Regions:
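Register position in tetratricopeptide repeats
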Residues: 40, 79, 113-114, 137-141, ...
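Short coil turns that delineate tetratricopeptide repeat
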Residues: 59, 64, 98, 125, ...
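TPR-repeat structural position
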Residues: 44-45, 83, 117, 144, ...
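Start-of-helix register in tetratricopeptide repeats
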Residues: 29, 63-68, 102, 129, ...
Length: 216
């Protein structure tokens, strides 16, 4: 009789555990979907809250789902301009898997925003963007020849970093413009326009350079 009673209790307990797990899974998924929707609509504060709620339901366990939620949270923080908080998460993720390209890229982007160019470069990803940021600082400091040299290095190191190549090309045109060689700058920026389509600042620079032809 006692054995039968124990069996019934165990079965009931197993059923309760299964129901609890199903409830947790359902709510984790709901929070994840809410977070992604907020991320898409640029409501970053609410996205972060939703991802935190999803993570909280895991009770400290860090698996694939939790790592993905942390990654989304870091993305929301990065987009909102909270680079230090995003950096802390990417550091944590990277420490667990240093071969993960997504973690390395996110970490490198945060390091660029926090000014640690050397460490960003050491990660070996988005090299074009790293050198472009260095060149931009050199341009802002009036060191145009140094910037052009950095840009050439960036092109050689960019690899598959097409975003970096685009940024390098634009900054190359700006450096030549500031050196006073409007013809060279226009030539580069027109090539940029053909490949990437000049918009925003690039479109304004292109229009300006076209008005400067004949003044060099």
């Amino acid at each position: 009789m006692m054995a039968a009673f124990v069996a019934v209790v165990l079965l009931a307990g197993g059923g309760a555990y299964g129901a609890r797990q199903a409830w947790l899974q359902k709510h984790r998924q709901e929070y994840a979907e809410q977070g992604l929707a907020c991320l898409e609509s640029q409501d970053y504060a609410q996205a972060i809250t939703a991802f935190d709620d999803a993570i909280a339901l895991t009770h400290g366990r860090i698996g694939t789902f939790e790592s993905q939620m942390m990654l989304y949270r870091a993305e929301a923080q990065y987009r909102s301009g909270d680079y230090q908080s995003a950096l802390a998460i990417y550091e944590s993720l990277y420490a667990k898997d240093e071969s993960n390209e997504t973690y390395k890229t996110g970490l490198a982007l945060c390091l660029l925003e926090t000014g640690d160019y050397d460490r960003a470069k050491s990660l070996g990803v988005i090299q074009g963007q790293v050198y472009s940021r260095i060149a931009k600082d050199q341009i802002n400091a009036g060191n145009y020849d140094d910037a052009l040299s950095t840009i050439e290095t960036g092109f050689s190191e960019a690899g598959a970093d097409e975003v970096g190549r685009e940024e390098l090309t634009y900054n190359q045109a700006v450096a030549w413009e500031y050196k006073g060689d409007y013809k060279k700058a226009l030539e580069i920026l027109e090539g940029y326009d053909q490949k990437y389509t000049a918009e925003g600042n690039a479109a304004r620079e292109l229009a300006f350079l076209r008005t400067r032809q004949g003044n060099h």
